Amino acid sequence: MKFVLLFGVLLVTLFSYSSAEMLDDFDQADEDELLSLIEKEEARKDCIPKHHECTSNKHGCCKGHLFKYKCQCTTVVTQSGEETERCFCGTPPHCKAAELVVGFGKKIFG
């Protein structure tokens, strides 16, 4: 009887220790996931919206509906006659075509 009681106490102790370790692992995973979501949200806040200037940060455009916007540059002649490069975030033509096809597909197939 003493052996069974001792074995039961040992079993309960091991079970509680292992469940505490599992809970710690789950808590750590939740914290890591939360930190990665916060980092993504911060990066999303710092991005440049569509049709805004991206001359100084050509890789900082935001994500559109399906694709990330690309920094598109053109050469502009100023009133003084100087040529300068101006860039804006926009959707490339091949991405526009893909979004159009997806839009038609959603309308047809619901």
UniProtKB/Swiss-Prot annotation:
What Gene Ontology molecular-function terms does this entry list? toxin activity
What the entry lists under InterPro entries is as follows: Spider_toxin_CSTX_knottin, Spider_toxin_CSTX_Knottin_CS
Q: What residue range is the signal peptide?
A: 1-20
Q: Which GO terms describe its cellular component?
A: extracellular region
Q: Does the keyword Hydrolase feature in the UniProt annotation?
A: no
Q: Give the propeptide segment as residue ranges.
A: 21-44
Protein family (similarity comment):
Belongs to the neurotoxin 19 (CSTX) family. 03 subfamily.
Q: What is known of its domains?
A: The presence of a 'disulfide through disulfide knot' structurally defines this protein as a knottin.
Q: Could you identify this protein by its name?
A: U1-lycotoxin-Ls1bb
Protein species of origin: Lycosa singoriensis
